[in-house]
């Protein structure tokens, strides 16, 4: 932050500070291989690369551009101030196109090779969470969404970004989506710890299915031990169960020994982390939320859904599972005019998908455990 003040950086971009952000990747190239940037024509983000291959258009779709920490969140344009401060060549930044609009047509080469007529290509939300958000099955204006997969993203949808001292302190990000709406959200490690733990047990010769793991977790003692899923030791691949035991020992908690105890510890900790993020969101927006709309692969875990309802003290609406795919399709249909609005898209998805409802249970026990959980946060 010698190049640009951290507070100013956040005030402009409204993005959560994460090592993997595009701004820091490009800054690394500025420091080590600037000649590559000087020679480059345009920076094309990964989702936009597919559009380029299909159409030949070098554009940046708004939602994925908004995650780079190089976009002015209020203007919806590349920030000259940030780009200049980091020493990144301006010429590499392509034109930004709105989410859910036509970006071009298939190239002649593709049409000839595949025997296709000219087909329009739509700029769907390149940031998968923004596609998933389109499929949240609600008509409410104010709602909490939880897109749950390897990563979990918990937040709300706003007309304008929230960028102030409180949101900066909580490291909450503002990301763009369809209709220039803002997703005000926290990035949280999601099912990664479960997935990596399972891979470790497979390496040890125990090929448990996810259903088996859930059954074992249900039989384990409740609310005994917690981890901070976002602690740095849980990010690298490897022996997550051992790291969980070490974390619990270090923080003076009962050490989960069995497979079921480890899985229960992870699920309980995720649910508590969701509550923690939800409280920060509520504090920043000044709004209350009666339902958490949970979408994505994590909704297949009835245990995690129920724990989330218990921890957050509110109803959880779980589904659709394939939220990103459905949102992607809906955005294409909105771009073509076949669906007239995001409200219509959400209603169609709500009527066509299996949505399960979970009500909170054991409130006193979870509230008491939450106070213990907050003490072990990194």
Residue ranges and their predicted role:
Residues 56-65:
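Enzymes and membrane/adaptor proteins characterized by extended Gly/Ser/Thr/Asp/Glu-rich
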């Amino acid at each position: 932050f010698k190049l640009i003040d951290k507070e100013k950086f956040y005030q402009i971009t409204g993005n959560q500070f994460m090592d993997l952000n595009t701004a820091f990747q490009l800054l690394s190239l500025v420091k080590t291989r600037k000649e590559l940037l000087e020679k480059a024509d345009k920076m094309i983000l990964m989702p936009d690369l597919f559009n380029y291959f299909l159409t030949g258009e070098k554009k940046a779709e708004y939602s994925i551009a908004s995650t780079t920490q190089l976009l002015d969140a209020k203007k919806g344009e590349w920030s000259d101030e940030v780009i200049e401060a980091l020493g990144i060549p301006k010429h590499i930044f392509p034109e930004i196109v709105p989410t859910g609009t036509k970006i071009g047509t298939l190239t002649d080469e593709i049409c000839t090779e595949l025997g296709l007529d000219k087909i329009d290509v739509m700029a769907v939300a390149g940031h998968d969470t923004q596609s998933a958000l389109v499929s949240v099955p609600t008509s409410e204006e104010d709602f909490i969404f939880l897109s749950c997969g390897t990563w979990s993203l918990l937040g709300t949808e706003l007309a304008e970004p929230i960028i102030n001292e409180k949101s900066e302190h909580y490291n909450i990000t503002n990301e763009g989506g369809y209709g220039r709406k803002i997703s005000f959200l926290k990035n949280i490690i999601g099912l990664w710890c479960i997935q990596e733990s399972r891979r470790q047990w497979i390496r040890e010769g125990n090929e448990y299915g996810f259903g088996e793991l859930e059954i074992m977790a249900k039989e384990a003692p409740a609310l005994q031990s917690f981890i901070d899923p976002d602690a740095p030791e849980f990010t690298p691949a490897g022996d997550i169960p051992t790291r969980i035991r070490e974390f619990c020992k270090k923080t003076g908690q009962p050490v989960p020994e069995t497979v079921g105890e480890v899985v229960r510890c992870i699920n309980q900790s995720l649910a508590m982390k969701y509550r923690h993020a939800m409280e920060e969101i509520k504090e920043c927006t000044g709004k209350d939320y009666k339902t958490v709309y949970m979408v994505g692969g994590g909704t297949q875990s009835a245990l995690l859904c129920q724990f989330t309802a218990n921890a957050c003290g509110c109803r959880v609406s779980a589904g659709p599972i394939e939220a990103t795919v459905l949102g992607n399709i809906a955005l294409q249909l909105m771009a073509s005019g076949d669906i007239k609005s995001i409200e219509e898209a959400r209603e169609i998805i709500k009527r066509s998908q299996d949505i399960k409802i979970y009500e909170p249970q054991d409130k006193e026990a979870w509230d008491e455990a939450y106070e213990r959980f907050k003490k072990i946060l990194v």
